[in-house]
Each structure stands twice: as structure tokens, then as C-alpha cells.
């Protein structure tokens, strides 16, 4: 695994050199303070001398003797383009023409303010914009690795006293949630899961961060197959009313448990999940009866067929997947059954 990590770091370094090689030289009147390359060979952005509103990947020399040109990122520039990031065409242009600036803005030596703005801008371009996702995967295939290994890793090293730490981490998780589902060939490396595990287990991590971590880990069910720790976390969040899960997250996490149990009928799930499932079955079966009654009465109320389909799936699975398949008709009077 260590060899894989280092090989990926080397690839990230090569990609970074190629990105910066296309950037323009910074204003000659500004004095840039270069940071030496880190242990992984990547030259990080540094704060420009004389003002914290700029960061720059200043002419650092890598171990291979490659000179990285300046690529300045100005807070004013980031703020000016935030609105453009949400526009379908302008967002694409930002990524196509200025992605190198956004990479610099997220590096370790950039201030939290710059990283917050740069990451917000990237996320804005990604939402509801498949061409941008395709562009990033095509032209910056190691970006997701950078987010895991560098951006999240660096943010985790900061103390909890910084009020931007968790908003920044949440932004990075959201970026991953936009990009990873777009690439069917993506596979989670073990160190990615280790990073997510470290983030999830931080003592003061907010609940919304935990939910996003679980969203990521359930993008590929093989991540949690045979991993009792992740299964316990998912079922704990799913069954904890204080987490305030919305319906979409309930579906996501239930579907993960459904898939695991369907594949491995011998899998033992926590009692709290089975108790939650029993209560959910009762409530959702009742809702299904009401929906059917309204349909029979020609009620003009618009039906949520997607919701009804999921409710029926959950109700049916209580015994067919998570219990005794023969018990459905005998033990559950709430089952909606069309004979």
C-alpha cells in the first residue's frame, strides 16, 4: 500500500508541474516568498510577502530541477468569480482556463480564507454541470487524489480552533461527492478510507461531516463489505433521530445495508438497525395504505411514486431480506399485499 501511495504522489507531482507550466508569470512588481517542496516533491503555494490577500506557487525548484512558474491567486479575483462559477458556460470556462489558480489556492501554504474561496469556486463549477466534471477527469485525472492526500490531509492537521477547518473539509467532501460518481472506473484506495476514518473519528467532528463521509464510503459497497466498523457507523447514524437525516440520506444508507444483506444473508446487523427497521416498516406501510386509498377514491392529490416505491421496498425487505421471508404475511398486518 505504501508503494501505491508514493507512486500516486509522484504522479500528482508530475501533473502539478504540467499544470503550472501553462500558467502566466505573476506581476513582476510583487515579491513572492517561495516554499520549498514538501517531502512528496510538490511545491506548495506560499503567501506573498507584503499582503495575505495573495498566494503564489512561486518559482520553486523541484528535486528534478524543474522550475515552477508563478501562479498568483488573489482573494478579490476569487470573490469576483464566485457568481460565475454557478453559470453553466462561465463555470466551464473557469475550469478550462484557470484551474491551475484554483489548485494553487487549495495548497497547504494558502490561508484558510483563500482555500475556502478556491474550494467554494470549484464546487460551484461542478454542481449541475456534467461537462465540467468530464473536463476535470480528462485534464486533471489526479485531482481527486490531491483532494484526499493533500487537501483533506492538510486540513486535518489543523487544530479545531480554526473556525474554517470543518467548513473547508465539508467543501472538499462535497467536491468528491460530485466527482467520484461521475467516473465508474474510480476505486477507493485503502489510504483514502484511512483518511475518511481519521476524519470521522475526530473528537469534535460535526454531524454533517460524518454524514458526508458515510455518503462517500457508501458510493462503493465494497468499502464496507466485511467492515463492521463502517457498518456500525452507518446504522448508528441511520437510527439516531438526533442526526436529523433527510429522506434521501435514509434511502442511501438503507440501500447500502440492503445490498450487503442481500449479498450475504448470514451478515448480522446491529439490533438498533433491526428495531429501526421495524418502526419504519410500520409507518411506511401505513403511508402506503393511505396513498392507495386516495388513489382508489380518485383523490387529485399528486402521488409521489418514487417515495411509494422505496417505502414498498423497505416494507417488503423487513422479512424477505433482513428476517424470515415466510413471515411477511403471517406477522406483519401492515404489509401492503396485492393478491
UniProtKB/Swiss-Prot annotation:
<keyword id="KW-0653">Protein transport</keyword>
<dbReference type="GO" id="GO:0005788">
    <property type="term" value="C:endoplasmic reticulum lumen"/>
</dbReference>
<dbReference type="InterPro" id="IPR031884">
    <property type="entry name" value="Sil1_fungi"/>
</dbReference>
<keyword id="KW-0813">Transport</keyword>
<feature type="short sequence motif" description="Prevents secretion from ER">
    <location>
        <begin position="336"/>
        <end position="339"/>
    </location>
</feature>
<keyword id="KW-0256">Endoplasmic reticulum</keyword>
<comment type="subunit">
    <text>Interacts with KAR2.</text>
</comment>
<dbReference type="GO" id="GO:0015031">
    <property type="term" value="P:protein transport"/>
</dbReference>
<dbReference type="GO" id="GO:0000774">
    <property type="term" value="F:adenyl-nucleotide exchange factor activity"/>
</dbReference>
<protein>
    <recommendedName>
        <fullName>Nucleotide exchange factor SIL1</fullName>
    </recommendedName>
</protein>
<feature type="signal peptide">
    <location>
        <begin position="1"/>
        <end position="21"/>
    </location>
</feature>
<keyword id="KW-0811">Translocation</keyword>
<comment type="function">
    <text>Required for protein translocation and folding in the endoplasmic reticulum (ER). Functions as a nucleotide exchange factor for the ER lumenal chaperone KAR2.</text>
</comment>
<dbReference type="Pfam" id="PF16782">
    <property type="entry name" value="SIL1"/>
</dbReference>
<dbReference type="InterPro" id="IPR011989">
    <property type="entry name" value="ARM-like"/>
</dbReference>
<comment type="similarity">
    <text>Belongs to the SIL1 family.</text>
</comment>
<keyword id="KW-0732">Signal</keyword>
Amino acid at each position: 500500500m505504501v508503494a501505491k501511495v508514493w507512486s500516486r504522489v509522484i504522479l500528482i507531482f508530475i501533473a502539478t508541474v504540467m499544470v503550472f507550466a501553462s500558467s502566466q508569470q505573476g506581476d513582476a512588481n510583487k515579491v513572492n516568498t517561495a516554499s520549498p517542496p514538501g517531502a512528496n516533491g510538490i511545491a506548495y503555494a506560499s503567501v506573498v510577502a507584503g499582503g495575505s490577500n495573495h498566494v503564489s506557487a512561486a518559482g520553486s525548484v523541484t528535486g528534478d530541477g524543474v522550475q515552477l512558474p508563478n501562479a498568483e491567486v488573489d482573494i478579490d479575483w476569487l470573490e469576483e468569480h464566485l457568481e460565475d462559477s454557478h453559470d453553466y458556460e462561465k463555470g466551464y470556462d473557469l475550469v478550462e482556463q484557470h484551474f491551475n489558480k484554483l489548485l494553487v489556492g487549495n495548497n497547504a501554504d494558502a490561508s484558510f480564507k483563500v482555500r475556502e474561496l478556491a474550494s467554494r469556486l470549484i464546487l460551484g463549477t461542478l454542481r449541475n454541470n456534467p461537462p465540467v466534471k468530464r473536463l476535470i477527469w480528462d485534464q486533471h485525472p489526479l485531482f481527486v487524489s490531491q483532494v484526499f492526500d493533500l487537501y483533506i490531509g492538510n486540513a486535518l492537521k489543523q487544530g479545531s480552533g480554526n473556525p474554517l477547518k470543518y467548513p473547508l473539509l465539508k467543501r472538499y467532501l462535497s467536491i468528491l461527492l460530485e466527482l467520484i460518481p461521475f467516473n465508474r472506473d474510480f476505486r477507493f484506495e485503502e489510504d483514502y478510507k484511512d483518511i475518511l476514518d481519521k476524519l470521522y473519528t475526530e473528537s469534535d467532528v460535526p454531524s454533517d461531516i460524518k454524514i458526508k463521509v458515510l455518503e462517500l464510503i457508501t458510493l462503493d459497497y465494497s468499502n464496507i463489505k466485511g467492515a463492521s466498523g463502517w457498518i456500525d457507523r452507518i446504522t448508528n447514524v441511520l437510527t439516531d433521530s438526533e442526526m436529523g437525516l433527510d429522506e434521501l440520506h435514509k434511502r442511501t444508507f438503507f440501500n447500502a445495508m440492503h445490498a450487503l444483506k442481500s449479498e450475504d444473508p448470514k451478515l448480522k446487523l446491529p439490533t438498533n438497525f433491526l428495531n429501526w427497521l421495524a418502526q419504519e416498516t410500520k409507518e411506511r406501510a401505513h403511508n402506503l395504505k393511505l396513498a392507495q386509498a386516495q388513489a382508489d377514491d380518485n383523490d387529485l392529490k399528486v402521488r409521489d411514486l418514487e417515495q411509494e416505491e422505496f417505502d414498498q421496498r423497505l416494507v417488503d425487505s423487513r422479512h424477505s431480506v433482513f428476517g424470515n421471508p415466510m413471515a411477511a404475511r403471517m406477522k406483519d398486518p401492515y404489509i401492503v399485499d396485492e393478491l
